[in-house]
Amino acid sequence: MSSLGFSVGTCSPPSEKRKCRFLVNNSLNKAEAINLRNKQKVSSDPELSFAQLSSCGRREAIIGFGFSIGLLDNVSALAETTSCEFSVSPSGLAFCDKVVGYGPEAVKGQLIKAHYVGKLENGKVFDSSYNRGKPLTFRIGVGEVIKGWDQGILGSDGIPPMLTGGKRTLRIPPELAYGDRGAGCKGGSCLIPPASVLLFDIEYIGKA
């Protein structure tokens, strides 16, 4: 299965057979990303480590969701629908707790693990950590993920923090996600179209 460097992604060097990693935060420039890498404790898993930014021909930074051309071959095109009543914060970020956690909440700057399924508003799945068989490991609250994730997990603007073991659905407006640029764009088509509202089912596993 061939891999694809998306408009806001990063890849491993061409000599290494690893999937492109989807960018979670598209606001960092290359210098900032390298500086963040030097300060950050990175997982020993090579797929979650910083890759050579130039290999995808992009200047944005790393650590994020895994995408490849054949991703949807192994994941349902439509998400499983579950009734969920959303509470909406002033920022437009909405949440619904399907399972309230039992353990400690995340602390800003902490390395945590979370499983997730990402969907468009029409229910089409564009990414799933469950499909890859392992959770995403990232540092929360420092810009490694889109703003909607940081706010939706840490708690902000009237949204309570997630607790370890909790399962929450986030409905994220474009301004807290990928904005008017969209993501995963190539040849006039985008996996995440511009100005998309995104739905994420997140399972907060806890501290990494």
From Swiss-Prot:
Cysteines joined through disulfide linkages: 84-96, 185-190
Activity regulation, short description: PPIase activity is optimal in oxidized form (S-S) and minimal in reduced form (SH). Reduction of the oxidized form is mediated by thioredoxin (TRX-M).
Subunit record text: Interacts in vitro with LTO1. The precursor, but not the mature form of the protein, interacts with the Rieske protein.
Annotated EC: 5.2.1.8
Misc. remarks from the entry: The interaction between FKBP and the Rieske protein probably occurs before they are imported into the thylakoid.
Upper lineage: Eukaryota, Viridiplantae, Streptophyta, Embryophyta, Tracheophyta
The keyword Disulfide bond appears for this protein: yes
Family note: Belongs to the FKBP-type PPIase family.
Domain PPIase FKBP-type: 109-208
Superkingdom: Eukaryota
UniProt keywords, alphabetically: Chloroplast, Disulfide bond, Isomerase, Plastid, Rotamase, Thylakoid, Transit peptide
Source species: Arabidopsis thaliana
Name of the protein described by the UniProt record: Peptidyl-prolyl cis-trans isomerase FKBP13, chloroplastic
PANTHER family: PEPTIDYLPROLYL ISOMERASE (PTHR47833:SF2), PHOTOSYNTHETIC NDH SUBUNIT OF LUMENAL LOCATION 4, CHLOROPLASTIC (PTHR47833)
Localization per Swiss-Prot or TrEMBL: Plastid, Chloroplast thylakoid lumen
A GO CC term assigned to this protein in UniProt: plastid
Protein purpose: PPIases accelerate the folding of proteins. It catalyzes the cis-trans isomerization of proline imidic peptide bonds in oligopeptides. Responsive of the major PPIase activity in the chloroplast thylakoid lumen. Regulates the accumulation of Rieske protein, an essential component of the photosynthetic electron transport chain.
GO MF assignments: peptidyl-prolyl cis-trans isomerase activity
Cited InterPro entries: PNSL4/FKBP13-like (IPR044183), PPIase_dom_sf (IPR046357), PPIase_FKBP_dom (IPR001179)
Tissue expression per record: Expressed in stems, leaves and developing flower buds, but not in roots.
A Pfam family assignment: FKBP_C
Known outcome of mutating residue 190 to S: Reduced PPIase activity
Catalytic activity: [protein]-peptidylproline (omega=180) = [protein]-peptidylproline (omega=0)
